[in-house]
């Protein structure tokens, strides 16, 4: 016998058909909350890092790849970190060390990818002790462990509390609008970066050709 009762979210509220795509779950959490948390972590991470670097440089420093206040590294890191580490909520020692290791590995992979595809790195640990290629260092690894505890124990629950205060339809529109703006922003920046790279390689090739011609 078919179950015709309406689907409900984690708060027991009915979900209309057009909103059901947002209720599909990944590792026990619906897509709506995952994307909303991703956006909030990305904005919060950008704000914290830009504030810190602006203080260090004594001038405003945008730590995002695009023009807007968005840093997806923190979005992915925060969401994935919580999904993986939340089972260790009551085991602080294991939570700290696993969080430190996973975050350091994630930071290294992101750094290598940026150097490979963008030709630049958004951070530089070369002046830090016990660093590796300027991408990771002991100081950041120690800090990542405490960040992991903070996210799992406090930040994520508070974030979900804020998300739940926003009406679902309004929240989905906000998420879609923000991600669309970010996609446009990042597309423009990628075009600019790769255009500069292509032009620089073209100029280098032109100089080599001119040098060969001059020899003849």
Task: Enumerate the language-model features and the residues they cover.
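Positively charged N-terminal leader segments that act as targeting/secretion signals
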Residues: 1-18
């Amino acid at each position: 016998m078919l179950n015709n009762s309406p689907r409900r979210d984690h708060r027991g509220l009915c979900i209309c058909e057009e909103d059901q795509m947002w209720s599909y779950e990944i590792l026990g959490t619906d897509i709506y909350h995952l994307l909303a948390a991703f956006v909030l972590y990305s904005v919060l991470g950008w704000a914290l890092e830009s504030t810190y670097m602006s203080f260090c440089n004594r001038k405003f420093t945008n730590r995002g790849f695009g023009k807007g206040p968005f840093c997806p590294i923190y979005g992915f890191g925060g969401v994935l970190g919580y999904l993986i580490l939340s089972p260790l909520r009551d085991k602080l020692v294991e939570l700290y060390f696993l969080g430190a290791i996973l975050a350091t590995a994630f930071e290294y992979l992101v750094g290598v990818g940026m150097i490979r595809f963008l030709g630049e790195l958004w951070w530089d640990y070369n002046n830090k002790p016990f660093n590796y290629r300027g991408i990771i260092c002991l100081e950041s690894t120690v800090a990542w462990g405490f960040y992991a505890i903070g996210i799992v124990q406090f930040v994520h629950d508070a974030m979900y509390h804020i998300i739940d205060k926003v009406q679902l339809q309004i929240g989905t529109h906000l998420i879609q609008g923000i991600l669309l703006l970010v996609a446009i922003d990042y597309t423009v920046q990628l075009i600019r970066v790769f255009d500069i790279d292509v032009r620089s390689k073209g100029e280098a090739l032109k100089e080599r050709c001119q040098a060969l011609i001059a020899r003849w």
